[in-house]
Amino acid sequence: MSAVHLASLSRRGGENDQFPFTVPAIRALDGLPLERPVTFFVGENGSGKSTLLEGIAAAARLATVGSAEVQQDDTLAAQRRLGKALRLSWARRTTRGFFLRAEDFFGFAKWLARMRAELIVEMREAAELYKAGGRSQTALGLKQGPLQASIAELEKRYGAELDANSHGESFLKLFQSRFVPGGLYLLDEPEAPLSPQSQLSLLAMIGDMISQDAQFIIATHSPLLLAFPDAQIYSFDRIPVQAVAYEELDHVRITRDFLNAPNRYLTQILKKDPPLH
């Protein structure tokens, strides 16, 4: 198993009466070892798992796949405060990798499409301008060369129309193009646009990348992703945050029980009976 880049994190400040330090899991955060190449943060919505992931992204100054970097995103001001209060302990510092919130991805895809369209328009305008001015094809080529190179690089990395694919296809294509060896990847609920089959494809990509010295920290609700072999799982439903086994997770137990007896579950739920225990 490959060694990790980010070995642990701890909190070293922050006002407990101000969000996000009012979140119980964040308030109680002391030290959190990150001993394995794949770490999962799991918990109910509002438990703090995504907030901590965003704080780590701010502290690590990772590139962001989204419409704005963590350092400039107006919606992440509180998470930047958290980032300043976190102490990251590195085994091997890496500047490779990225932070991704599933909810931001489609804004990113639209931004890529807009950038490509603007480059194409600029090329056409240059051609018209140079033709009207009687400029040579050589001069036009010198003008258009960098624009063509930028378009080619975008298409090489993301395809000609990333936003034209299905959500799941676009997501997986992004991962294929942006995962590089030796990177740190912070993924917030990456299962959101993915079918079960696509989640298995993502697991395969993660397995391939950790064999190339990558590290992943993932906030998720997905029992499929959480099943990754030898992953560290931290529950944010326990205060302080605690490591838990896969079989102990409510996400796993409830999903398994439901699939084993869906009619029994649905009968009780639809009759508004007390929840099953």
Predicted feature residues:
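C-terminal lobe/lid and adjacent interdomain/linker elements of RecA-like ASCE P-loop ATPase modules
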Residues: Q197-Q215, S222-H277
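Phosphate-binding P-loop
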Residues: I26-R36, S177-P181, D208
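Conserved D-loop beta-strand region of ABC ATPase nucleotide-binding domains
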Residues: D188, I218-A219
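Phosphate-binding glycine-rich loops of NTP-binding sites
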Residues: R36-V70
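N-terminal pre-Walker A segment at the start of P-loop NTPase domains
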Residues: M1-D30
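Catalytic acidic motif of RecA-like/P-loop NTPases
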Residues: T39, E191-L194, G207
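Conserved ABC ATPase signature
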Residues: F98-A102, W111, A117-S201
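Flexible phosphate/Mg2+-sensing switch loops adjacent to catalytic phosphate-binding sites
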Residues: L62-W90
